[in-house]
Structure formats: C-alpha cells, structure tokens
C-alpha cells in the first residue's frame, strides 16, 4: 500500500508518466546505449523479431534506447502479422510483462496463428532480402556496402546483426 501511495505521489509531483511506469516495472531490460538488442533471428515463443522488439520497448520506457526505435518498420512486421498496434504491445511492457508473458499475450491477442503459421512467417521474415524490393533497393545498398556486405545476397536480419556488431565494436 505504501509503495503504491508513494508511487502516485511521485507521479503527481513529476507529471512524467514514463518515470511513473519505470518506477513500477519489474523487468528493466537492456541498456541499448551500451549493448545491442537481441538479434531479430532470436526466436521468443517461436516468433522472430519478438525478443528485439521487447528489448527496444523496455529500453524506450527506461530512457536508454539510444539510436534504436520502437514501433519501427521491423517491429511492424511482427505487429502486422498478428494484427496488433505498437501501443497495445507497449502497454503490456509497461505493466512489467516478462518475455514469457509477452509470448502468452501475443498468442492470445490479435489474429490467431497456429504454431505452423508462426514458424512459416518467422522463416519468411528471416529470409527477407530488401534488395529484391525495387522501392527499397537503393536505400538498402547504401546501408550494407559500408559494412562490406553484398546487397543482392544479404538478408535484412544479417545486415541488422552486422550493423549492431560493428556499431558497438566502434563504441567500445
């Protein structure tokens, strides 16, 4: 009771919803100013992207998201697959949901998907090559060439992993 009353007192004094949420969150997550989020290939509950999206959302709430973005086109691949909105996802993270609780919420929310559909979708997004999309081809080529990657053969997730590795290696 005291903790809740104190929390509301802090909220009333600071008028900053983010600080209030952070005060009560159970799971702090990664500091993305010091380390990258999980690879988009890391599957949580069978979903590609999910671990990375969770890391970015938690970091956003804690104020240490660095140069990453939550509810970006990558995250929206997951949200679109399930028919969800980033704000709904964020609301669950704000409640302090663990990775497992997020999997359970994702399975129960939005469009119902079978384990086979989830696996097939995860495999498809992992193999996505932006170079094959004429609208993204030039942009993607600009992004991967400084990293020594071939835009024609590099999947999106490989580029993200390489960019994370190189970016944090420079910072170290």
Regions found by a protein language model. Name each.
Residues 89, 93-147:
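Amphipathic protein-protein interaction modules
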Residues 26-65, 125-171:
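Polar/charged low-complexity regulatory segments
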Residues 64-106:
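Amphipathic alpha-helical packing elements
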Residues 41-48, 69, 73, 77, ...:
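Alpha-helix boundary/N-cap detector
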């Amino acid at each position: 009771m005291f903790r809740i009353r104190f929390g509301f007192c802090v909220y009333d004094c600071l008028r900053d919803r983010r600080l209030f949420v952070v005060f009560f969150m159970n799971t702090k997550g990664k500091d993305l100013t010091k380390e990258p989020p999980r690879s988009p290939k890391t599957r949580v509950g069978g979903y590609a992207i999910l671990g990375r999206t969770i890391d970015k959302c938690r970091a956003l709430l804690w104020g240490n998201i660095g140069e990453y973005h939550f509810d970006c086109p990558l995250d929206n691949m997951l949200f679109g697959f399930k028919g969800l909105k980033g704000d709904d996802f964020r609301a669950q993270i704000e409640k302090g949901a663990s990775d497992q609780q997020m999997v359970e919420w994702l399975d129960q929310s939005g469009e119902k998907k079978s384990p086979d559909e989830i696996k097939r979708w995860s495999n498809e997004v992992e193999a996505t090559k932006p170079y094959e999309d004429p609208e993204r081809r030039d942009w993607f080529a600009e992004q991967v060439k400084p990293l020594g990657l071939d835009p024609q053969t590099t999947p999106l997730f490989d580029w993200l992993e390489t960019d994370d590795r190189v970016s944090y290696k420079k910072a170290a």
